[in-house]
Amino acid sequence: MPVKHWSRAGLMLTAWCNARCASCYLCCGPDRADEMPVATALRVWEELIAASPHGCRIHLTGGEPFGSWERLIELCLAARAGGLGPLESVETNAFWASSPALVGERLRALDQAGMGKLVISADPYHQQFVPIERPRLLARVGEDVLGAHRVQVRWRDWLETGGDTDCLAPPEREALFARYAAAGRERVSGRAAFSLSASLPQRSPSQLADTSCSEPLLRAKHVHVAPDGSVMPGTCGGLVLGRCDHESVAVMWQRLGQDWADRPVVGALARGGPAALLATATAAGFVPEKTYAGKCHLCWHVRRFLHRHGAGEGELGPDWLYQA
């Protein structure tokens, strides 16, 4: 099966985030210190564009990329000065948006540095840590500075009708999270596998046995690059396709196309989905739960076991993601 070129990539500038959201499939939080140096980000950005005949659209993400404003704007300005492809978007939870003046100043700077869209996170999980007035302020000023077509909110309905969730009693907040997760918007892996899975419809591992993962792993054309250079499928945090700190993106992509089927983790998932990886883990002593909230939940549980038992070397990481 040919591996499609990556035409969209998110550079994780940091694993740090002011929030520790129940929905975070990358397990980011205030205790994460991993950062991608500007020089590394520029090199990877350039290599991603060069490795694909169609180019590669870049978005900057985290963690929370606004955790270091100076580094964020330095990267954007350097990328523009270096003639790299357009910056598709920058993502943020708006924790920093404390005044119209500050928001306007930073958005004008990003606009001049070539940012396409501003992507704002707003949902019950983020509002446990970020007052909802901050994403509302950011969206409002963003539409004035950039135009409404360049401001994207995930999710707009919550931004308009939601509220702060840190003030809710834990049972009330958990019930709200459960109702929101039931809409199917979240990836049930990482922290979400522990925080949200119990409230979702459950299926036995045998009911998840007919789902190959070849499309999201090899054909989806979207990846994330972690601060340490680990390249992960766009929606599969903790599954490593290669390391662009060890070799160029082009060489890494070629290597994946040549040997993906021989890789113990990626190969098993591409052929038979989490059920195939479950067989490997069971032989090593893994005991599955009776039910899971979908194949991503099962996959995460299996991968976490394998990582903790020293299996999947080079394919499971970064390490901090599995230590949550």
Question: Model-derived features: where do they sit?
Answer:
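Short cysteine clusters
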Residues: 17, 21-24, 216, 229, ...
